[in-house]
Amino acid sequence: MPKQHLVIATRQSALALWQAEHVKQRLEALHPGLTVELLGLTTKGDIILDTPLAKVGGKGLFVKELETAMLEGRADIAVHSMKDVPMEFPPGLGLGAILERETPMDAFVSNQYASLDELPEGAVVGTSSLRRQCQLSERRPDLKILSLRGNVNTRLAKLDAGDFDAIILAASGLKRLGFSGRIREELTPEVSLPAVGQGALGIECRLDDPEAMALIAQLQDAETTARVSAERAMNHRLQGGCQVPIAGYAEITGDQMRLRGLVGSPDGAQVLRDEVEGPVAAAEALGTELAERLLQQGAGKILEAVYGNHS
């Protein structure tokens, strides 16, 4: 008899709960008779809020506690933002599905300025991401970029309190939480190449639980999976965590994929860009090829310097 009850491990931020609830509703609609329960957990990344993420260090800051709950049998599956999911999974766990992607772009949010280019010289911009900091600094070295941690609501509150002239967030999180109206400008990939997997949701599960795997398999989106697989393969070859100045963005037209990648120093002084094109069927190979091209340009030295500063 198939499973009648499923427990989803989730972080407890508003966005994480929205994402888990979204998966719950989709699963219950797909499988009449199935009940789904949420298990809210607190992760290391949620607790350490006074330190820039890159300095907290380690991979999987937002997933480890969820993985432990699955391995201990307290939860059956976990819902993650794909950009937070490490490349390596603990023994016994794996990715069961990647859902259809919301926009992967970054959003410019400000109460005073309509666009990034309108920011005056020396304006204060908040972001938690070395990837965004790198690209912003390259484009606008005059800007003062400060670390901004906390969930979406907290970050918006800090902007509204006047701590920043503008902040940069993932557009997907704002849209999912009903804050589309706060987006003044969606930054193009030319201005801010997105994080690997940004905007996509992934479901992690136990590999020895074929019933749960069968239930979530129907949520898999083939195009998103191919795009994210290419981006993650690039990240994997570069040995990137989720807190490094690496960007990757795949687009699909017909059966062809274009994959763009970026590695840069956080201060924007050195930024390497490259891209590859090829068949969608070779998504992971394209990611590895792009990483090799970036490494040939010197990406390894840039990343070593970053890891050295934040180890």
From Swiss-Prot:
PROSITE patterns registered for this protein in UniProt: PORPHOBILINOGEN_DEAM
Quaternary structure note: Monomer.
Cofactor note: Binds 1 dipyrromethane group covalently.
Role according to the record: Tetrapolymerization of the monopyrrole PBG into the hydroxymethylbilane pre-uroporphyrinogen in several discrete steps.
Pathway stated in the Swiss-Prot or TrEMBL entry: Porphyrin-containing compound metabolism; protoporphyrin-IX biosynthesis; coproporphyrinogen-III from 5-aminolevulinate: step 2/4
Residues modified to S-(dipyrrolylmethanemethyl)cysteine: 242
Name of the protein in its database record: Porphobilinogen deaminase
Gene giving rise to this polypeptide: hemC
UniProt keywords, alphabetically: Porphyrin biosynthesis, Transferase
Similarity comment: Belongs to the HMBS family.
Superkingdom of the organism of origin: Bacteria
Lipid biosynthesis keyword on record: no
Cofactor dependence: dipyrromethane
GO biological process: protoporphyrinogen IX biosynthetic process
Source species of the chain: Hahella chejuensis (strain KCTC 2396)
Classification via SUPFAM superfamilies: Periplasmic binding protein-like II (SSF53850), Porphobilinogen deaminase (hydroxymethylbilane synthase), C-terminal domain (SSF54782)
GO cellular component terms attached to this protein's record: cytoplasm
Xref: CDD domains: PBP2_EcHMBS_like (cd13646)
Gene Ontology MF terms: hydroxymethylbilane synthase activity
Classification via Pfam families: Porphobil_deam, Porphobil_deamC
Substrates-to-products reaction catalysed: 4 porphobilinogen + H2O = hydroxymethylbilane + 4 NH4(+)
EC number from the UniProt entry: 2.5.1.61
InterPro entries the record matches: HemC (IPR000860), Porphobilin_deaminase_cofac_BS (IPR022419), Porphobilin_deaminase_N (IPR022417), Porphobilinogen_deaminase_C (IPR022418), Porphobilinogen_deaminase_C_sf (IPR036803)
Additional remark text: The porphobilinogen subunits are added to the dipyrromethane group.
